[in-house]
C-alpha cells in the first residue's frame, strides 16, 4: 500500500461524515452552555467545536454537556482565547496534539469509525492582531505532519480565522470552505474547511444567548448507535393547564370531606388529584435519548427552533424569541 498514491489511498475508504456544530462562544458561561445543550439535543451533532472558551483548568469540569467527551485547550497566562472539541461518547476519538500561545489556540483530534477513513478535526482560534505568517506556518506544518502520519485520513479544519488569508493553504491541502455567509455582523470570520467532497455547505444557526457570532451546522451522516429509552410523562400544554386549573377550582372534594380518618382523607385527596390529572394531563409513553437533561423540555426545544427559523429569515422577532428562550431555560432549570 505504500506504493499507492495518497489520493487513491483516501478514495479506497468511505469518508466519515459526522454532523458538526461550531460557534465562537466569547466565554462559555453557564447560560451559553445551557443553550448549547439545547442545540445539541435538537441537531444531535457528533462533534461540537468551540473557540474563545475563556476557560481554565479549574472551570472546565463545570462545562460539561451530557453524552459528550471534552477535549480542551486553554490559553495560558491570560484571559481569553481557548478552544474545545466535544465528541459524542459513542464515537472513538483520540486527541492528537494541541497548541496554545499568546497568538493562537488550536486542538487536533482523530476520529476512527469502522470501515471509514480516519477523520482529523482541528479547532483553531486566530485572534485579531496575531501574526498571519506564524499561524499559516503552524497550520501548514501540522497538517503536513499529520497527513504523513495518517495517510488515509481526511480533514476538517474549523475555527475563527479573523480574515486570515487561507487561499494558498487551502490549495495546497485540497480544502474547500463550506461557509458561504457572514458569521459576525458583515464579516465571515468563522470557517469550516474540509477535503471531504460529499459535504454540503454549512447551515447558519442563531447565536447562543447574547453572543454576536452565529453558529455553524455541518450536516453529515450520524452513527446509528445512539441509545434511546421510553419514558412515561404527562402531556402538559397551555390548554391542559387551563382545564386542570378549572377542574381543581370546581372540584367538590366530597370524598376528602366525607372520610373519617386522616389516612382516609389523604388517600381520598390523592385519588381525586390523580383522577383530575389523568383526565386533563394524561400519561403518554414517549421516546427520548438516554441521559437527556430533564430541563430540556419540548417547549424549550420548540422555542429554540422558532428562534432559528426567525434568524435565518432575517426577521426582527428572533431577538424577542432569543430573550424568551433565555427566560424559559432559566425557569426550566429552577424547576
Question: How should these model regions be labeled?
Answer:
Residues 1-152, 162-185, 193:
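Short phosphate/oxyanion-binding micro-motifs
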Amino acid at each position: 500500500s505504500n506504493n499507492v498514491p495518497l489520493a487513491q489511498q483516501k478514495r479506497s475508504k468511505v469518508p466519515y461524515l459526522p454532523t458538526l456544530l461550531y460557534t465562537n462562544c466569547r466565554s462559555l458561561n453557564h447560560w451559553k452552555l445551557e443553550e448549547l445543550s439545547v442545540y445539541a439535543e435538537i441537531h444531535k451533532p457528533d462533534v461540537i467545536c468551540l473557540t474563545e472558551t475563556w476557560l481554565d483548568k479549574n472551570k472546565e469540569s463545570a462545562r460539561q454537556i451530557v453524552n459528550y467527551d471534552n477535549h480542551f485547550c486553554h490559553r495560558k497566562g491570560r484571559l481569553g482565547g481557548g478552544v474545545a472539541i466535544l465528541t459524542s461518547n459513542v464515537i472513538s476519538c483520540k486527541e492528537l496534539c494541541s497548541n496554545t500561545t499568546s497568538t493562537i489556540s488550536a486542538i487536533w483530534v482523530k476520529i476512527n469509525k469502522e470501515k471509514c477513513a480516519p477523520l482529523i478535526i482541528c479547532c483553531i482560534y486566530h485572534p485579531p492582531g496575531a501574526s498571519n505568517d506564524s499561524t499559516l506556518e503552524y497550520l501548514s506544518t501540522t497538517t503536513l505532519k499529520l497527513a504523513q502520519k495518517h495517510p488515509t485520513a481526511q480533514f476538517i479544519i474549523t475555527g475563527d480565522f479573523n480574515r486570515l488569508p487561507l487561499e494558498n493553504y487551502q490549495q495546497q491541502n485540497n480544502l474547500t470552505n463550506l461557509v458561504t455567509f457572514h458569521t459576525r455582523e458583515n464579516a465571515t470570520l468563522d470557517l469550516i474547511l474540509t477535503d471531504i467532497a460529499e459535504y454540503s455547505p454549512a447551515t447558519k444557526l442563531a447565536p447562543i444567548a447574547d453572543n454576536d457570532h452565529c453558529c455553524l451546522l455541518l450536516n453529515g451522516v450520524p452513527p446509528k448507535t445512539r441509545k434511546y429509552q421510553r419514558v412515561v410523562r404527562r402531556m402538559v400544554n397551555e390548554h391542559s393547564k387551563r382545564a386542570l386549573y378549572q377542574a381543581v377550582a370546581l372540584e367538590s372534594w366530597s370524598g376528602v370531606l366525607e372520610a373519617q380518618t386522616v389516612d382516609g382523607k389523604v388517600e381520598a385527596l390523592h385519588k381525586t388529584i390523580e383522577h383530575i390529572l389523568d383526565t386533563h394531563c394524561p400519561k403518554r409513553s414517549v421516546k427520548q435519548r438516554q441521559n437527556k437533561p430533564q430541563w430540556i423540555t419540548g417547549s424549550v426545544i420548540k422555542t429554540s427552533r422558532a428562534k432559528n427559523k426567525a434568524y435565518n429569515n432575517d426577521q426582527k422577532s428572533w431577538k424577542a424569541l432569543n430573550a424568551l428562550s433565555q427566560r424559559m431555560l432559566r425557569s426550566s432549570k429552577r424547576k
